[in-house]
């Protein structure tokens, strides 16, 4: 929490805990003592077992997150998505955020399975998706044209009310700098009503992460 304490514009922290640890609840309770703690990220992508999210020990940890009114971010790829609906069903009050739109394989263009599995999440109203990290999945052509199909699909399936923008900084700098990343997404999105833009670039994050009204995560009001 050092950075959150040092910079007032950091209004919320999504941290990491070992979801399989027997004392995960105690660790969450310690973190909750910090006023900016908002949730946990489950890094399924980093696990060698693609069924990691289905483990009983992990699901117990996720229940502990849900019981404390926290948000669960999911760092997943296409192969992990079949387990997400079960998490939503078992924890209907848990706010789930699929980071980076589950990292669609933009570079290969093999999106059929990703589309199918993402569409299966739509019926669950407690699942949101973070529009972030796309240019780094686009291979040698990190352009608006490259990411437009997945952005359009996300808007069509989930609607703007269930999408949150994220910069994915500093990882995003592997493909483009901060300003270029932001502007490329704007180009890929195309025209948006002002109200929809406000939701995507801040309003939805305020609601999902329970941030104080009037805050602007990451300085979005001054974004280019």
Label the predicted regions.
Residues 52-164:
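Catalytic pocket-lining loop regions of alpha/beta-barrel enzymes
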Residues 1-68, 74, 112, 121, ...:
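Mid-domain alpha/beta scaffold segments of enzyme catalytic cores
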Residues 13, 40, 65, 100, ...:
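Conserved, mostly hydrophobic/aromatic
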Residues 26, 30, 83, 117, ...:
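Alpha-helical elements of Rossmann-like donor-binding domains used by nucleotide-donor carbohydrate transfer enzymes
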Residues 19-22, 47-51, 104-107, 136-139, ...:
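Short, small-residue-enriched loops and turns at beta-alpha junctions
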